Amino acid sequence: MVTYCTLCHTGLVWDPMVNGTRLHFRLAGINNGNALIRDEETSSVWQQSTGEAIFGPLKGRHLNVVRSNELTFALWRKEQPQGDVLKPDAPYISEYEKKGWETYVEKTVVVVDTTKSGIGPHQLMLGVTVAGKNKAYPIDAILAARVVQDQVAGAPVLLVVGSDGASIRVFDAAELTFTKGEGDALMQDADTGSGWNFQGCAVDGKLAGRCLREIDAYKDYWFDWMNHHPETAVFKG
C-alpha cells in the first residue's frame, strides 16, 4: 500500500497484511498534521507516518514497512526501464498537476511546537532508524555534501545523492570509508579504491560486484519527524 501525506511530505509503503488478512485502507483524516488512514475491515485508524493503529480493535498494532525510494522520474526510469507507471484517476488529474502546492503547505500553521529545537517546523529531513535509534538529516545539507558518512546507534551509515542531484539513498557503510566519485561511480572507498554506484554496488576495483545493504529512510518535515520520534538525534555536519 503506497501512502503519501501532503502536509508532512511523507511517502511510505506499507504491507497491508495483518494477522493473515489483507486490509483495505482509505484516508480518514489528519492528526497533528499527519494523515490518518482507516481500514475497512475493522475500522481501526492508523497513523500514516508510523504505520501504527491508534484507535479501534487493532490499536497498538503496526504495519510492516516495505522499503521504497523517493526518486526523480528520470532516475527511476534509468534504473527501471521496463517499470510500470501508475496513471492518476482521470477525475482527479487536475489536482495532481497543481503547481506550487509545496510552497502553500510550507506556510500552513502546525500544532507541534518545534521552537525549543531551534529548527523550523517545515525543515525537510531524511529520517533514518537503526536498531531503534532515530536520526534526522537536513536534506539541504545532504544534497550539498553529496556523500555523507555518519553513525546511527553506533553503526556506520552512508548517505548518497544520486546523479540527478535530488534523490538520496542510505546504506550500511560496512566499516568502509567513502568519498565522492565520478560518473557511474558516485562514490569511492578509500580502503580499496573501488567505485560504487547509486544502488550501493561496487562497479570496479577489488570489491567489484559487492553490494552494500540498504537502510530504510524517508523524507519528513521536521515537525512530524520530531513528533513521532521525540528522542531523535539531528545531524550537525
Residues of each region from the PLM?
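Mid-to-C-terminal functional-domain signal that highlights helix-capping/loop sites
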Residues: 1-237
